[in-house]
Each structure stands twice: as structure tokens, then as C-alpha cells.
């Protein structure tokens, strides 16, 4: 089932159930898409305004990138579900099966791929939102701040879906490579999201 085609209420209802998907990864992707859309909205409210004519071309180009990014993040809701299937099947293999460990290892690495990609997309979104916050309509700057907060949350949530899998990998070299990549994104882009939030907040005298 493609949960992105369901209502918000249905998504939350299934998320709260014992269904295997959506889970944390799918939720992270959806929150990231919402955060990206909030930044994109600032662009929509900027284009066509005489006050922002000098940056209009840049904003239009940025909006096109966000359109694609929103779609890609929503696609990850389904991709995360699909990526988890091999791991779920691997855990069902009898423990005395000589191939179990190798199959489980491969499935665990596969399960890391989608949340890692969600992290990358959220980092990209936060970078775009910084531009919207700096150059977009002042009337909608709070939405840019909200978008940054959402994308930071999505980034952090996706990272946990990486770390829960790397923790169980037997190949520690591969695990540490993925951990280093994920932590690098967290360190850089959580800080940038915080900077956006604090700048927007300060603009309101807070």
C-alpha cells in the first residue's frame, strides 16, 4: 500500500498500529517532505512580488529543485517499506541455517540505504531553506523556520533508522563508514537548521 496516497488521518492510524510499515523511516520521509514544502511555500509567496524582483530567478530555480525534492522524499515512504522486507524475511530464517548470517548481513545493509538517502535529501532541503529564509518574503519567514525545524527532525529520525541497523552489522568497517557519513550529516546540517531557526526567532525579537 502506498501510504502517501492515503489521508493524513489514515497514515497516522496505520503508523500507530502494529503494521510493519510505515515506521520511523517512512515517517521521517514524510516530515522531510513537509519541511521542504514549507520552504517551497516561502518561494511561492516571493515570486511575482516587485520587492523581490532581484532574486526572483534564483527563487524560481530553487522552487523547481524543491518540487523534485518533495516528490523524492515522498517516494522514500514507499521505498523504506520495500527496503525493510528483506530484513524481515531474514529474521525469519531458522537460526541453524548456515546461510542465515550472510543473508541477514546483506539485508541489514540494504535496510540502511533508504534512511541514509532520506538523510541526504533532508540535508539538501535544509540548504535550500536557508536561501528561502535569507532571501524570501519576510511575511513568510516563519514558514522557512518551521521548514528547517521539520527537516532537522526528519534528518535525526532517519539517522536512528541507520544506526539501529549498523549496530548489528558484523562487518564493522562497513558499519563505521556508514556511521561516519550519517554523523557528518547530522553535525553539519542540524547546526545549519538551528542557525536558521535562531535567526528567524531573533527576527521576532525573541
Please identify what each model-predicted range represents.
Residues 80-149, 153, 165:
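Amphipathic alpha-helical interface segments
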Residues 50-89, 185:
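A structural-propensity feature for long, helix-poor, extended segments
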Residues 3-21:
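Short, hydrophobic/aliphatic alpha-helical segments
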Residues 79-91, 193-206:
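Long, charge-rich low-complexity segments
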Residues 125-128, 140-199, 206:
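Preference for long, well-ordered alpha-helical segments
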Residues 41-53:
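Transmembrane signal-anchor/signal-peptide helices with a preference for the extracytoplasmic
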Residues 30-34, 62, 69-76, 107, ...:
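Amphipathic alpha-helix face/heptad-repeat signature
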Residues 17-40, 140-158:
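Conserved phosphate/anionic-ligand binding catalytic regions in large, soluble enzymes, centered on
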Amino acid at each position: 500500500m502506498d501510504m502517501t496516497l492515503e489521508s493524513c488521518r489514515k497514515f497516522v492510524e496505520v503508523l500507530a498500529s502494529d503494521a510493519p510499515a510505515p515506521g520511523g523511516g517512512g515517517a521521517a520521509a514524510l516530515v522531510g517532505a513537509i519541511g521542504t514544502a514549507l520552504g517551497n511555500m516561502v518561494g511561492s509567496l516571493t515570486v511575482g512580488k516587485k520587492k523581490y524582483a532581484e532574486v526572483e530567478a534564483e527563487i524560481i530555480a530553487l522552487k523547481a529543485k524543491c518540487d523534485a525534492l518533495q516528490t523524492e522524499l515522498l517516494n522514500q515512504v514507499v521505498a523504506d517499506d520495500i527496503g525493510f522486507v528483506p530484513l524481515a524475511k531474514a529474521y525469519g530464517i531458522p537460526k541453524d541455517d548456515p546461510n542465515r548470517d550472510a543473508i541477514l548481513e546483506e539485508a541489514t545493509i540494504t535496510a540502511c540505504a533508504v534512511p541514509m538517502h532520506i538523510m541526504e535529501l533532508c540535508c539538501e532541503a535544509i540548504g535550500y531553506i536557508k536561501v528561502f529564509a535569507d532571501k524570501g518574503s519576510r511575511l513568510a519567514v516563519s514558514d522557512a523556520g518551521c521548514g528547517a525545524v521539520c527537516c532537522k527532525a526528519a534528518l535525526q529520525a532517519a539517522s536512528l533508522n541507520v544506526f539501529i541497523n549498523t549496530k548489528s552489522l558484523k562487518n564493522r568497517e562497513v558499519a563505521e563508514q556508514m556511521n561516519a557519513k550519517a554523523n557528518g550529516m547530522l553535525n553539519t546540517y542540524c547546526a545549519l537548521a538551528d542557525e536558521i531557526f535562531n535567526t528567524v526567532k531573533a527576527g521576532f525579537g525573541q
